[in-house]
């Protein structure tokens, strides 16, 4: 009998297991893959402050590179460049980072089983590909796969290739906006170091494989090292994180950012909060304590995620012509102001700045108004 079984050896799942085991309880992590950390779906962007809050100190293996600037391109080829030095953003190797957290969880006493799939819940535990396991609590960290039957409109197809190319700039992330090619999202280039980078595309109902190939051909010569196809979730947190003895964490709970689908920090904190709350419920023999996990996560991220969802609604409703006009309205002062921000994970104010609407309704003439006005009002 385990105190908790966690399905999914993701960062969120491993952090959940770490906190449960840290408190002296037994936790079992089920990972369906052959190893923790693979395949590497994530772009790997995270701030040093976020990693510190997650209790992770980067090793030489898990650190790839440091990001100094972000270059954002409009559909007609204009661009702005933002100094991101103050945000202290790094690119991490998710395969190694997840293994690092797996070692933390194991050192506290958690058990990790690879090549083991979760098949379903049974009265006293869970059914797995390696037999039934009894447990008191079940934690769903299976990622976007858990959301497929909840709301398909919130799931975007994504392709990310790891490539070697001489056009990848060290220390610079590139974002390409194009509502015709990547509706509701964008293409990106994230440098990993030594001429290697992660190149990806995502958007509503796109043919990700074809579009990433077109993007790469347009960029120049390249060699593909690895191909990853994985959906992302962009609709924010699900309605409830807990039901009876089941706890949902990470991407499965919709805890990735609605704007970029990034979730190392927000999903990781979800894992820590869930693990601590489960430990408290076990210690007090009171499963009603589980609701504290959801309350804590929403208190930390709820307001920011609501604003990011509003920003997403606005951005999904504008066309390329409008995006180009917005780029024309961005002033050096706006860029300097955004560059001065030091928080990578709570970034709605920067989005408002980029829309050119802080303190005015000029851009409202280009957009359909209710969400925009609400977004502006949340910025004070």
Model-identified regions with their sequence ranges:
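Glycine-rich FAD pyrophosphate-binding loop
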Residues: 7, 21-41
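FAD/FMN-dependent oxidoreductases across multiple families
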Residues: 205-283, 291
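Hydrophobic anchor at the start of a short beta-strand
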Residues: 4, 17, 25-27, 138, ...
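C-terminal helical "tail/cap" subdomain of flavin- and related membrane-associated enzymes
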Residues: 279-380
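Conserved N-terminal glycine-rich FAD pyrophosphate-binding loop of Rossmann-like flavoproteins
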Residues: 33-55
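Predominantly flavin-linked oxidoreductase catalytic cores and closely associated redox partners
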Residues: 9, 103-224, 238, 254
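A conserved beta-strand/loop capping segment in the N-terminal third of enzymes
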Residues: 49-100
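Beta1/beta-strand and adjacent pyrophosphate-binding region of the FAD-binding site
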Residues: 1-12
């Amino acid at each position: 009998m385990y105190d908790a079984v966690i399905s999914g050896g993701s960062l969120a799942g491993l952090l959940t297991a770490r906190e449960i085991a840290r408190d002296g309880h037994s936790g079992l992590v089920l990972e369906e893959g052959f190893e923790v950390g693979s395949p590497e779906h994530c772009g790997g962007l995270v701030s040093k402050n976020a990693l510190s809050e997650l209790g992770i100190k980067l090793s030489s293996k898990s650190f790839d590179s440091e990001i100094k600037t972000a270059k954002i391109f409009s559909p007609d080829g204009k661009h702005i460049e933002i100094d991101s030095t103050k945000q202290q953003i790094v690119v991490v190797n998710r395969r190694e980072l997840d293994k690092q957290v797996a070692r933390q969880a194991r050192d506290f006493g958690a058990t990790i089983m690879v090549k083991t799939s979760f098949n379903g819940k049974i009265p006293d535990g869970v059914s797995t590909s390696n037999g039934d396991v009894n447990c008191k609590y079940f934690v769903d960290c299976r990622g976007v796969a858990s959301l497929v039957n909840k709301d398909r409109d919130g799931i975007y197809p994504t392709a990310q290739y790891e490539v070697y190319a001489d056009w990848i700039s060290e220390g610079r992330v590139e974002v390409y906006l194009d509502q015709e090619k990547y509706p509701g999202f964008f293409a990106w280039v994230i440098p990993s170091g030594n001429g290697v980078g992660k190149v990806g595309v995502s958007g509503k109902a796109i043919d990700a494989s074809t579009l990433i190939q077109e993007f790469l051909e347009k960029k120049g010569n390249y060699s593909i090292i690895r191909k990853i196809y994985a959906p992302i979730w962009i609709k924010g947190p699900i309605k409830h994180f807990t039901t009876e003895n089941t706890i949902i964490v990470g991407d499965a709970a919709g805890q990735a950012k609605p704007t970029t689908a990034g979730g190392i920090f927000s999903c990781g904190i979800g894992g820590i909060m869930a693990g601590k709350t489960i430990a408290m419920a076990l210690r007090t023999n009171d499963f009603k304590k589980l609701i504290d996990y959801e309350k804590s996560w929403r208190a930390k991220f709820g307001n920011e995620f609501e604003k990011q969802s509003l920003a997403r609604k606005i951005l999904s409703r504008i066309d390329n012509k409008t995006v180009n006009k917005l780029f024309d309205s961005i002033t050096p002062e706006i860029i300097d102001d955004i560059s001065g921000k030091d928080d990578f994970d709570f970034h709605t104010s920067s989005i408002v700045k980029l829309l050119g609407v802080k303190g005015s309704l000029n851009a409202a003439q280009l957009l359909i108004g209710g969400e925009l006005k609400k977004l502006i009002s949340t910025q004070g």
